């Protein structure tokens, strides 16, 4: 009977979400039996073979051909067409769809760029069965007729966000706009959502700190527990949780208040009865005949007035399908007292509360207003109070703040505006989009490219430093939210210029020389032609690699397309870019134990995953970068060659050479390789290096590149992978 003492959200979770049952004959991955085995699955996710539309499907083109006005009309009609199997509150699905869009986008977090609306991950486990997403399976099912009609022209990710926008607009709110471009995923993402897979487990460590890279305070929540931290109705403590969670999702205090106040202007919460007695398993544990729907409610009709979602019950406003100032007015108009919902959840009602809110399904029945503990937090926290009172006295400022915050919430994970599609994209650019200046000059041509590469190699800069600079600049890219990369040449700006991994003093000298060459070249042009530093950084790295290949007897030319521009410091939010600082980069044999939350080898896989690399691409890149000697601080770890600076396959040849015996060194994460016969020290390595001979899957690839007939193949594979990283952020070439 211990369940009776637990917060309602936990009861909802225990009712069936997060099913962990394993069938007796279920085939498990290697990691199930050997949990210490390195998991390479992140490098094999979302392959083209998973996409039923086919590898050649061009979503951007399909979206651009979409009749957006017809689609929006169909959505608007759907909003007020109540279905008997899931009746609309107040005859309008708008608030329901706002919650769907919000909870799809709200999983985004800044530390690793994971989560967000892109991919439509709310359709898959575990998100589809999170306690905070109870009944959103019905929202998506209500949308299915629209998705069915427009098919490949709009992804689930785009449709859910657009539906949230249309819902707001249909209830009298003017949104800032909408951008398409969220391609759908076809399988669950592999994301670390918390240290414990139990629903609503605390995501804080033993010292009470919210673990990185997490943003939600409890497993299975989008942000925070609406009843208060751990289900305890403490508004001030709740404010602390809100501030931490929202800041990790890229929202400041004003944006946080605008989102909560704006969102809670609409709709109601649902807690008609005890979830323990009424609610079945979530989608992940529901029987097959439920067809992917979960949380079957056996009480009453199971829907309408009997609906159970969060366990809290009631509305914040007497006009829950209209955009009004009532939320803020009610927050300050009444003195609020704690009570419990019919489901037993902690919530707040006005003292001497009058029944003034119409029932969502029977207009003849009236209810009192209510607030969550998280709502009261906006009134009692000193900083939030300043903002809520300002918004209360300036409705226009509130409306504008909500519009901007909503647009940011639903588009933050899409990356730069260059990826946006459609005719509803706002003309205004925002600092959180990492804006870039337009190129107002003529691009360099093939003759210029050849000349600049020759001039770069004559600067006297070691080739390893040119390669290292290009890698440091481009490898900040994250495919999770399309941030970072070389475009903008932000490596010369704060904060990147002073990142430890970039060896600031050396980096500044390289950049000074390249900047001087850039200025000289541009000054000599008479036809409006210019080269950006961003282009020159990549070009110089290419030139150095071509030289390294030439030393190995291989002539090649790395493809190069100019078009990158140089951002200004004013276009670069230092705090926002600080989260991109690597805590580890296995490609440079760099690892900061004090700032990393996973091992060096796991960090390598995570980095490769962020760069959208496959297992062979990661392997080729690391082996090539090692022999070209680009390790941070000129570390000798993994430089398995007697000819550093020559692009060849010696890293793999020497790594797999059985004449070397490896043992741990006294220094942490360092290994010594001794000659088996003489005992002489031959090489030094990190765990990141040795994993390519110890892990069976990585060794299999390493053996290919170590083979006598694979020398040229390795060089060309390295160049192809290098070029992929250098162009990861070139959305003008390939709108991902």
Swiss-Prot record:
It is found in: Periplasm. GO terms for cellular component: cytosol; periplasmic space. The keyword Aminoacyl-tRNA synthetase does not apply. Formation of the three residue Trp-Tyr-Met cross-link is important for the catalase, but not the peroxidase activity of the enzyme. The record marks 99 as: Transition state stabilizer. Residues 1-23 form the signal peptide. It comes from the Bacteria. Its cofactor is heme b. Binds 1 heme b (iron(II)-protoporphyrin IX) group per dimer. Its main location: periplasm. It catalyses: H2O2 + AH2 = A + 2 H2O; 2 H2O2 = O2 + 2 H2O. CDD domains: catalase_peroxidase_1, catalase_peroxidase_2. Its EC number is 1.11.1.21. There is a cross-link at residues 223-249 (Tryptophyl-tyrosyl-methioninium (Tyr-Met) (with W-102)). InterPro entries: Catalase_peroxidase (IPR000763), Haem_peroxidase (IPR002016), Haem_peroxidase_sf (IPR010255), Peroxidases_AS (IPR019794), Peroxidases_heam-ligand_BS (IPR019793). Heme b binds at residue 264. Keywords: Heme, Hydrogen peroxide, Iron, Metal-binding, Oxidoreductase, Periplasm, Peroxidase, Plasmid, Signal. Bifunctional enzyme with both catalase and broad-spectrum peroxidase activity. Belongs to the peroxidase family. Peroxidase/catalase subfamily. Homodimer or homotetramer. This is Catalase-peroxidase 2. It comes from Escherichia coli O157:H7.
